Amino acid sequence: MSEPGVVLVHGGHHDARCWDPTVEELARRAPGLRAVAVDLPGRGRRPGDLMSYSVEGCAEAIVEQADAAGLDEVVLVGHSASGMVLPAAAERLGAERVRRMVFVAASVPPEGGTILDTLGGPWRPVAARAARRPGPISPPPKIFAAATFCNGMSREQRRFALDRLVPETPLLSVLPVSRAGLPPEIPMTWVLTLRDRSLRPGAQRASMERLGGVDDVVEIDTCHDAMISEPARLAEILLARVGRQVGLG
């Protein structure tokens, strides 16, 4: 069996660059492993209209970038709000290509529901107001983003994260999703961020229950943006799911 590649999908107000520290760790620990961080439509290098956003368009973007990288079998990794689009990408790729799905501090709506249906804490009123906006949403104020995404980061990590926040579609929290076509045989891992202020552990466990089929839960004592705060630990987790036995160091 050939070694799968790793496809990394960002969440809201982020783009592919947020994965750079983890991609670097993967390359250092496992030379030759193919890993690609994708941009969803309207972010980074991927053209698109943030006001014409759809789950289907995101899934198509993920598949196209995986194909462009020459990846056949893959481990799909999604952070935060990409929990709503990762199953659609897996459905398009099919069980014959998706070795495993990994959800990192993700938000998974109820079947047929929206992310707004799941939100509590500081994000619900923000998302509800944002959904009524006539244009893209500016990145959150840095003081707010630092508190919700970056608590516990070093100064350098926090600067890296905040400098790479991007505008977001107001549709993100109100798009209904369906996982009816997700192949049930694809195994799923959940990376649970214990100090997460954006999606607290209880909210993540509720998302796990809505998703169903999670057979592997790994806890990290870190904040929401684990790919920046704990890239070495996250790389180790991903390599174990790929099948590479590479330890820390």
Where do the PLM segments sit?
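Active-site loop/oxyanion-hole signature of alpha/beta-hydrolase fold enzymes
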Residues: 34, 40-75, 89-92, 116-120
